[in-house]
A protein has these predicted regions:
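Short loop-to-helix capping motifs
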Residues: 59, 72-75, 148, 182, ...
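Short, conserved catalytic or interaction motifs in soluble domains
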Residues: 23, 95, 154, 262, ...
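Terminal intrinsically disordered/low-complexity segments used for targeting and assembly
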Residues: 2-71, 119-126, 139, 163, ...
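Amphipathic alpha-helical coiled-coil segments
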Residues: 78-93, 176, 180-203, 207-217, ...
Length: 490
């Protein structure tokens, strides 16, 4: 049988080097549809309208609130601090590409017991002091430089990874701004909706009180029973109870806006008037194409940057399996002294190099490669999930807007009929042709219809805000500042 060649250390090293040469795993590009499934009509995205989408609602109070929130919100400040952290990490990684300079120094003294008798005939006898204790001093001061050459690019890969982390942090900061703008707009819409509900309840209470007065007058005239008076009074009291609960929710909505704006409690209540309606964007919102999300949505840009950073870390882990070469150089001065008998000082210079070849590390480096690959796969799955959720958000918003627009039209038609029925019931009751229950039912129907129209308008405004945000609106995109997803190793 042929004998097997022994595995020499060099063979093991070459095996490790060959395994390190394997490329970073390639992953397929994301599957993005060409058009929106629920789009009413295809229109290119309006970048200018998306950048300041809150102005599309034509509400100066909303525009002012969003701008103040973007200037003062604490979540945005925290996100910007994370950008500064990423920049510091880049400086730290990039420093590995350059030499390091140190100014080391040392000094020491030794005390040696002298038990020997002086010997004048010894060649060094004249330099050896005859003290009982001999002191030996040494010192050194030097300027030292060390440079690990990045021959195979491991440090460069980590530096590029840190750059992608900055890109991710910047995108996350933009995403934080978009979230603040969205929450502010949603909070403002809810506030105006609650104010509208309050106005309806106040009007309903006034109508109920008027109906109660009519019932009392008719009762005193003997035309109706006491039951009509008590029923009308109960209706008024029920509406007043609803008003008390609504005032609590209204206070909560105002306080939530104060927190978003990073202002003291009560600021919003003092600054906003109560006469505004729930704002709506009257113009249609062009959704563009699904592919636009990859350039507009900051969360997708952040995920793509995280994926690119993970790919570069995987590449760096593979490059760590290659040999290393470092150069050291030093210049300085050193000195020696032997008690009072002898002293000397001189200049020196050193130049050297160290070479390292991975040999036996119990699979530490290969485990680092496996870990980097797993993190890369996690980043890839995270990007895919974020993209799927982004597509779902846009489709869901398109469905909501289309449905809420049709629903609002139907609710307005219902309101016209309810109001007419209430007017007819009031006239009939005054003429004695209808009983109080019919009037109360008509009043409840009219109030409920008006509330439903308000709720439908609120739902449509909320859906419009959600679509603007889902499309990545709220910032001016710099095409030179964002890389394509194809550059993320997909």
């Amino acid at each position: 049988m042929p004998s097997r060649l022994p595995r020499t250390p060099l063979a093991w090293a070459l095996t490790l080097m060959l395994s390190a040469c394997s490329s970073v795993p390639e992953r397929p590009a994301p599957d993005v549809p060409e058009s929106w499934f629920h789009a009413v009509r295809e229109q290119p995205a309006d970048a200018e309208a998306l950048a300041d989408w809150w102005q599309q609602f034509d509400d100066p109070a909303l525009t002012q609130l969003v701008r103040r929130a973007l200037e003062n919100n604490r979540d945005i400040r925290l996100a910007m601090l994370r950008v500064d952290t990423a920049r510091a990490q880049l400086r730290q990684a990039r420093a590995g590409l350059f030499p390091t300079f140190d100014l080391p120094g040392s000094a020491s003294r030794q005390w040696i017991e002298n038990n020997n008798e002086p010997n004048p005939d010894s060649p060094i006898g004249e330099f050896v002091p005859d003290d009982d204790v001999i002191t030996f001093d040494s010192w050194e001061l030097a300027l030292q430089a060390t440079w690990e050459l990045d021959i195979f690019g491991a440090t460069r890969a980590r530096t590029d990874s840190a750059r992608q982390q900055i890109r991710s942090a910047q995108a996350q900061a933009i995403a934080a701004r978009l979230a603040v703008a969205s929450n502010t707009a949603q909070g403002y819409v809810q506030l105006r909706a609650l104010e509208g509900q309050r106005a309806l309840l106040v009007e309903g209470i006034e109508l109920a009180a008027g109906l109660e007065r009519i019932a009392r007058a008719l009762f005193e005239a003997g035309e109706v029973t006491r039951l009509d008076v008590e029923a009308s009074a109960a209706e008024r009291a029920s509406l007043e109870a609803d008003l008390d609960e609504l005032d609590i929710n209204l206070a909560k909505a105002r306080l939530a806006l104060d927190t978003l704006l990073a202002e003291p409690p009560g600021s919003t209540a003092h600054q906003l008037t109560t006469s505004a309606r729930v704002p709506l964007a009257e113009q249609a919102i062009p959704a563009g194409q699904p592919l636009d999300l990859l350039r507009r949505r900051p969360d997708l840009i952040a995920e793509a940057a995280q994926l690119e950073a993970a790919q570069l870390q995987s590449l760096a882990a593979r490059r760590d399996m290659f040999p290393t070469l470092a150069v050291q150089a030093a210049v300085g001065r050193s000195g020696l002294a032997l008690g009072d008998a002898f002293s000397s000082a001189s200049n020196f210079a050193r130049l050297g190099a160290t070479f390292g070849l991975p040999f036996l590390d119990y699979r530490r480096r290969s485990a680092a490669v496996e870990l980097a690959d797993v993190e890369g796969e996690s980043a890839y799955l995270g990007f895919q999930q974020a993209l799927a959720e982004a597509l779902e958000e846009v489709e869901r918003s398109l469905v909501r807007i289309d449905g809420q627009q049709r629903r609002l039209t139907s609710l307005r038609t219902t309101l016209r009929h309810r109001q007419l029925a209430y007017e007819l019931a009031q006239k009939s009751y005054r003429l004695g042709e209808a009983n109080l229950n019919e009037v109360l039912d008509a009043q409840r129907g009219s109030l409920q219809a008006r509330q439903q129209v308000l709720q439908g308008r609120t739902a449509l405004a909320t859906a419009q805000v959600a679509l603007f945000v889902a499309l990545g609106g709220g910032w001016e995109m710099d095409p030179n500042a964002t890389q394509s997803i194809g550059g993320s190793g997909l």
